[in-house]
Structure formats: C-alpha cells, structure tokens
Amino acid sequence: MYGPVILPGHMKGNPHSWLKKVIEGEEPPHQKIPNDSTSMSHLHDLASLFLAAYENPKASGRYYGVYESWHWKDIYAELQKIFPRMKMPEPITEPAVEPTGFDFSRRDSLGVQMRDIPTMLRETVEWIKSLPFKSD
C-alpha cells in the first residue's frame, strides 16, 4: 500500500520503511532484484474504490483494489529515476517472470481514476520526505 499512512507506527511496514531508508541514503532491501512481481495500490485510490462500490447499489461481489502488478526489475528501474544515486540490487540473470495479470473490468466499472505506479512511487517518496510525523 503506497501513499500517506495514518499513524507513525505504520511507517514501520512495507513499503514505507524501506523507502525511508533509501531516502536516507541506505541500500534497498534486496541484494538481488527478485524475479517476481508485486501488486501495488495507493491508499487514496483504494479508499475511493471502497466509496464508489459502497455508493453504487449495483455493486456487489469482489473488486480488485490494485492498480496493477509490476516486476521488481521495473519497480527498481522506476525508483532509480527518483533516486539516481541509489545502489541498485544485482540484476536478475534468468528470464523475468510475467507479472500477475488481472481482469480490471469490474474495478474500472466503478469509475475511479487510479494513480499509475510511477506516480504512486513518486507521491509516496515525496510524502515521506515531508517528514509527516516529525515532532518539533
């Protein structure tokens, strides 16, 4: 889950904890890029999906609450655009697995415009950099 968190303790979870470390100049969590994918969603987008489903009397059943799934090599490539000096994990040497695929037709029927992954990453990093829980 990307985007702002509600409580300071939430900063200890993924992805906020390791993004904060990268902001502070530490290494990312992987020594080698995982040959795997992860599904990503922004907190505000997920909340908007919940509200849209709740307010739609025709909505029923399950809806995917993620934007999409990206391979870790693509996530790290995007993070390198944000953090040009970040030490990159070792690249994968085998063929990359396909990211998890979804049929988003039900999700999209709710009419919620979701942030793409580059925007999600950038906004989350900017939010963490703002030191939201800094006490004076």
Q: What role is predicted for each listed range?
A:
Residues 4-8, 74, 97-104:
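Short, solvent-exposed polar/charged micro-motifs at secondary-structure junctions
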Residues 20-63:
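Alpha-helical substrate-binding/gating segment
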Residues 42-46, 71, 116-117:
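An acidic site on a long C-lobe helix of protein kinase domains
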Residues 47-96, 124, 128, 132-136:
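Mid/C-terminal beta-alpha module of Rossmann-like enzyme folds, strongest
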Residues 93-113:
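Conserved C-terminal active-site "lid" loop/helix of NAD(P)H-dependent oxidoreductases
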